[in-house]
């Protein structure tokens, strides 16, 4: 069925403001004039002259809801994924926002997503595009760095800004006065990623690290500089976690001697460390072949899942050899193989499959389903989903995972979920011929 121009314009907007830009690119390649179809399209694609022409003809249009989403024009520009997905159009989109602001656009323009999620223009700039220039532009125009409103879910701006490797956008938002409790909360999100520069920025720009943040960092095997930054910013050093373990005990259990040294230098209580902690650490570091007797098996299972999430192949092997269960704790919803596949960790997938891991899971899911879902949604193998585009997920790692699973006899699901993409379509997108 051939779409008319308004339908194609709506399809362009839908794709340009989503994580999947492929249809937007195809539509623009087929009909470059579609970028100037209306004010919404011109904003989303960075057509500066067209935006200026329309504003000159009708100045009040700068703040009127328009286009297929009924948004103010500035929102189409700020939420356009072309800002980070098309280097040719990005300068134009920034200039569009500048001209809209000069013409009186509201830097706090917003819409409500899915009934109760507040989405402000700054979220598009800092949390979706990760664009320092646009973030600074909106803040200088008066955008509120705290996206919170009674009755709606907020905290999208900083929560997602801290997912990017460059800490600049998150820093700009914090320094502009983001509410302190949100800064503290989002430090936890930042710790999901292996980026010490981001954590150091949080810690030197007002974040108040908790004991939980310190435990999170050590359990996730973050580097010594991250642990030092958290402690130096006030994280309680000897508080126990939910398992009754201090940060030093956790570091010793991982065999992380450099992290343990940082903790000891800053006064961690050495008397809390037990022979069991040292025995587990000796096994995981390869100094001893076995863990001490009496270890609760679920503790090994949990450490193995964390090792898989972090991509630690040697630790995973040693934990399996020490008694961690190949399919994980039966009481847990987490599958070790599912974690490896979702995160695109091919070597770990191969290790688990060769050791006999089940290809289907207790919850009805499957290893191949986890891999296919990750190929569309897992932007970072440690941090998981973020606001980046599908294009930014390295497809080669998922293609290798699929080859391993298919060779082991895994079957491709018809669809991902009740109304998701077809499994064979996703397999083909990874450059693999779907099995007969």
Predicted regions mapped to residue ranges:
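Ankyrin-repeat-protein effector appendages
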Residues: 2-15, 34-38, 176-181, 204-209, ...
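Solenoidal tandem-repeat scaffolds enriched in leucines and small polar residues
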Residues: 119-200, 204-208
